[in-house]
Structures are given as C-alpha cells and as structure tokens.
Amino acid sequence: MLSPQRTRFRKQHRGRMKGISYRGNHICFGRYALQALEPAWITSRQIEAGRRAMSRNVRRGGQIWVRIFPDKPVTVRPTETRMGSGKGSPEYWVAVVKPGKILYEMGGVPENIARKAISIASSKMPIRTQFIISG
C-alpha cells in the first residue's frame, strides 16, 4: 500500500474539493490514460487494486504509471466513543482527486488491450472516469 514515509504533521484538516484539476491533467509518460471526471478521495487500497488489475490484465509487456499518491491522512475515532477528547488517530491514507486528474497511464501495448485493462481499473475506482489517448 502507498503511504508517505514521513510527514510534517500527523493529522490534516478535511478540506474541500472545489473546481477542476489544473495540475496532472495531461498525459506525460504513456500513450493511454484513465482520467477522473468527479471529485473524490481515493484510498491507497483502491489505487493498489486498480494497479494490480491493470498489470494482471496486460501480463508482461507494457508499462504502467500511477500518477496519484495518497498523501492525506484520514483519522477515525474508535466506535462508541463520546464526543470530545480530541481528534481520532490516523487510520488510512487518501489521494485528493479533482475532475480532470490523470490516475493511471499506460504505454507499450495496443489500444484494445490498454482499453480493456484501463476499464477493469476504472471499475475499482469510486468515481466516474474516462479513457483518453495522447496526441
């Protein structure tokens, strides 16, 4: 699972997901990509599940780039705990994804294989996505 090696602070504010992504919205490494169409928090488990699904589908050959990284800690309070007594402890990590952000890129495979692999990865994501081709 992806997570930062160290962070400056253990806990973060939840924040808001306004607007569209101005960074990370162009294909940089591969030829095909999966682009987000909705805002969401994507957990490190979901990112890993999508990556595994893609790599299993293409087997050998081709290359996969993961363009998002979970760098936001999500805190969870223990169940049946009374209000107060501070914020909960960090439980898992998420990547904040806005519309337009590229999630995965793929290269070195024919388009039909890439389309199939990326559609399997998109089914692992909690948001609507689209398949795009560079050029």
From Swiss-Prot:
GO terms for biological process: mitochondrial translation. GO terms for cellular component: chloroplast; mitochondrial large ribosomal subunit. CDD domains: Ribosomal_L16_L10e. GO terms for molecular function: rRNA binding; structural constituent of ribosome. Keywords: Chloroplast, Plastid, Ribonucleoprotein, Ribosomal protein. It comes from the Eukaryota. It is found in: Plastid, Chloroplast. PROSITE patterns: RIBOSOMAL_L16_1 (PS00586), RIBOSOMAL_L16_2 (PS00701). Part of the 50S ribosomal subunit. NCBIfam families: rplP_bact. Belongs to the universal ribosomal protein uL16 family. This is Large ribosomal subunit protein uL16c. It comes from Glycine max (Soybean). The lineage of its organism: Eukaryota, Viridiplantae, Streptophyta, Embryophyta, Tracheophyta.
